[in-house]
Regions:
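Conserved S-adenosyl-L-methionine
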Residues: 17-23, 122-126
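Hydrophobic Val/Ile/Leu positions in short beta-strands of Rossmann-like dinucleotide-binding domains
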Residues: 1-2, 26, 106
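Rossmann-fold cofactor-recognition segment
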Residues: 45-64
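NAD(P)-binding Rossmann-fold cofactor-contacting core
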Residues: 19-50
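Rossmann-like NAD(P)-binding element
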Residues: 30, 58-90, 105
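Glycine-rich adenosine-cofactor-binding loop
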Residues: 1-17
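Rossmann-fold NAD(P)-binding glycine/threonine-rich loop
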Residues: 85-89, 94, 100-152, 156-158
């Protein structure tokens, strides 16, 4: 399940489609935005159904009842919403909906531990922040600009200390 709508969410959704992921659930507070992205991606999910009657590509509103059902059916949640940029933000997913079987990736890289990642740990689930994504985006940009391998270890250290 992907909380998508902005640039990072769209990029992650497109990569999921290009990699032919088995199932993608797009969740957004503005359902029309998610539906538009669903239409763009639909051709990548038009093949045979591997999961029986379960939709391979689905759009849901970012509402507790819709999230509750989906979270019981999936393994990976990607938060690409801005919720969590500030430490005072609430978790975009209520802790009562999180379960140990979930892996949560919070694309936010502003802080090591976001409200969602704290809730994830409290629920006994696994989580990761967006620092690795930021690191490898920066490394790729470095290699394009300077035409040499990026100093990944030094870049990682700067991010962690930074």
């Amino acid at each position: 399940m992907l909380g998508a709508g902005g640039g990072a969410g769209r990029a992650i959704a497109w990569q999921c489609a290009l990699e032919r992921c088995e199932r993608l659930v797009l969740a957004n507070r503005t359902l029309a935005k998610a539906k538009e992205l669903e239409r763009e991606l639909a051709r990548y999910f038009a093949g045979p159904r591997l999961l029986g009657p379960v939709a391979q590509l689905e759009t849901i509103p970012w509402e507790e009842s819709a999230l509750r059902f989906q979270l019981s059916q999936i393994d990976l949640v990607v938060n690409a919403t801005p919720l969590g940029m500030n430490q005072t933000d609430p978790s975009p997913i209520p802790i009562s909906l999180l379960a140990p079987h979930l892996m949560i990736f919070d694309a936010i890289y502003k802080s090591v531990t976001t409200p969602l990642l704290r809730a994830t740990a409290d629920a006994g689930a696994r989580g990761a922040n967006g620092l690795a994504m930021l690191l490898h985006q920066g490394a790729l940009a470095f290699e394009i600009w300077f035409n040499r391998p990026a100093p990944i270890a030094e870049m990682r250290q700067a991010l962690v200390e930074g």
